[in-house]
Amino acid sequence: MEPISHLVKSSLPNYLSSLPVPDSIGGWFKLSFKDWLALIPPTVVVAGIGYTAYLAYCPAARASCSAKISGRCNNQIRKNEPKVVDMIDVEDIAEKAAFCRCWKTKNWPYCDGSHGEHNKQTGDNVGPIVIKK
């Protein structure tokens, strides 16, 4: 506990008081390159804390982030089966058929273009598998 106490009561205040923070707006333009380098670490820490708070408390950021890191791809199609397998005879295909690979289609197993919205939300680049005769 003593190291934490020393950090909070002595080291951190000494570090912060030694930072070259100017008293006026004009003082920012007079900082040297070395002064600017000294201001980078606390700026990165403050930005990191702000970004973490943004992800924690902003619903839009949370939804976007969780969509990108979600490991499951099938969220709705035949969830009662242990493995979804569809057999399609090549003779049944007229000229060509596009099959879904993103699991977002409402017309399973055929692609209806739902991957476009999925790609926008997740940054993915999935598309259909197209079979030609």
Swiss-Prot record:
Cellular component terms (Gene Ontology): endoplasmic reticulum membrane; mitochondrial outer membrane
Residue ranges of the TM segments: 36-58
GO MF term list: 2 iron, 2 sulfur cluster binding; metal ion binding
InterPro entries: CISD1/2, FeS-contain_CDGSH-typ, FeS-contain_mitoNEET_N, MitoNEET_CISD
Cofactor note: Binds 1 [2Fe-2S] cluster.
Cofactor needs: [2Fe-2S] cluster
Membrane topology reported for the UniProt record: Single-pass membrane protein
Gene Ontology BP annotations: intracellular iron ion homeostasis; mitochondrial transport; regulation of autophagy
Keyword presence, Metal-binding: yes
Positions bound to [2Fe-2S] cluster: 100, 102, 111, 115
Protein name per the record: CDGSH iron-sulfur domain-containing protein 2 homolog
UniProt source species: Drosophila sechellia
Lineage: Eukaryota, Metazoa, Ecdysozoa, Arthropoda, Hexapoda
